Amino acid sequence: MALQRQLLKRATSDIYHRRAISLLRTDFSTSPSIADAPPHIPPFVHQPRPYKGPSADEVLQKRKKFLGPSLFHYYQKPLNIVEGKMQYLYDESGRRYLDAFAGIVTVSCGHCHPDILNAITEQSKLLQHATTIYLHHAIGDFAEALAAKMPGNLKVVYFVNSGSEANELAMMMARLYTGSLEMISLRNAYHGGSSNTIGLTALNTWKYPLPQGEIHHVVNPDPYRGVFGSDGSLYAKDVHDHIEYGTSGKVAGFIAETIQGVGGAVELAPGYLKSVYEIVRNAGGVCIADEVQTGFGRTGSHYWGFQTQDVVPDIVTMAKGIGNGLPLGAVVTTPEIASVLASKILFNTFGGNPVCSAGGLAVLNVIDKEKRQEHCAEVGSHLIQRLKDVQKRHDIIGDVRGRGLMVGIELVSDRKDKTPAKAETSVLFEQLRELGILVGKGGLHGNVFRIKPPMCFTKDDADFLVDALDYSISRL
């Protein structure tokens, strides 16, 4: 967090901007953009309501006065978002922006999607809250629909409120089921910021100096920056060796994202999980798939990210896109593993809340009805190919990677050494905002643009984004 705030603060300096621009002119080969004029946001039929609330400055002052100091904001001049519709957001002046980050990969179906709004509203009129000490059909209906999306014997659902909670529960299940404490995760991973999941996370910008015992981090199977390139078998051998030399020989579990989100849209090397799952199970552990960002058809090729590696986990965690913005998460596992929790009381006050359950079920229905997985595959392929074409013209683009609408653009100051272009990324980040495009940033050095929009994002939106990036790089 401290590093991110420092980078954002530095980006506000005119000197810093001039240095970044100078670096680009000196070190990079850039070709002129195809466009002579800045591209325009695609047309969209929606009239935002007149805004009569507090200004951005007033909101910022309240944040500083009443909210925790760990919070940070994007952009030199913070953006005051007051309305959203599908893949677009509106500021206090009524200006429209293309949301290419989906509230940090959370708004899956689109802002204020009518079907989801209707489900939430109708349930709210009847019953807003009742815990699982009573019966209510909404939680059962949602659990049944979610279990139907899972392969194998993954049929028992626990509802929580966030990804951190989901991963916390998954880790507890793994430890109770196996009788071991030792967990394995990947370097560059993000699995949450709670007191336990912060141990699974392996990015120093997110880690406080707290006890994190019995958690091991193995070499990240990163095809772009990893020591073994795209050879999944060599990365898997590191897991085997780590279990042999760095643990008791028996582990509780292994957890991984199929495409690392906060880490910069890093897709794991092909075949990696298939080999690692076998190694971990032979060591007595269970395999956990973190689908908080990759799930629900976002990758296009598959409904779940783990399916891209041809594996079936023992536990699956999910959040973010499951609720389209509602505070909702889930853990899905087998009846055998779930049974270890029956000896005590496990209770979550808001887990399975009727309103969240109704909204979550509506999300599943919208994804199916509107064929969003197929849409992600089609639009994502178009987006990635266009980005790769732009990469050929600009040396600053070191890597374009991802699947469907989960895409990363890594910026480097030297393609051979892959030096993170931190300063230049900050400049382009601001320029894209000025052109009306909101993207995310990720990776340890903050030099990866994270393109993960709502799944209603269109080819026209993709063209606008790519043209804006091309235009911005060409004019630095």
Curated annotation (Swiss-Prot):
Gene behind the chain: AGT2
Keyword vocabulary terms for this entry: Aminotransferase, Mitochondrion, Photorespiration, Pyridoxal phosphate, Transferase, Transit peptide
PANTHER family: ALANINE--GLYOXYLATE AMINOTRANSFERASE 2, MITOCHONDRIAL (PTHR45688:SF3), PTHR45688
Similarity annotation: Belongs to the class-III pyridoxal-phosphate-dependent aminotransferase family.
Annotated Gene3D superfamilies: Aspartate Aminotransferase, domain 1, Type I PLP-dependent aspartate aminotransferase-like (Major domain)
Subcellular location: Mitochondrion
A UniProt-annotated Pfam family: Aminotran_3
Highest taxon of source: Eukaryota
EC category name: transferase
Enzyme Commission (EC) number: 2.6.1.44
Single GO MF annotation: zinc ion binding
GO CC annotation: mitochondrion; plant-type vacuole; plasma membrane
Entry protein name: Alanine--glyoxylate aminotransferase 2 homolog 1, mitochondrial
Catalytic reaction equation(s): glyoxylate + L-alanine = glycine + pyruvate
Organism: Arabidopsis thaliana (Mouse-ear cress)
Transit peptide start-stop: 1-12
Subunit structure: Homotetramer.
GO biological process, one term: photorespiration
Sites of N6-(pyridoxal phosphate)lysine modification: K320
Cofactor section: pyridoxal 5'-phosphate
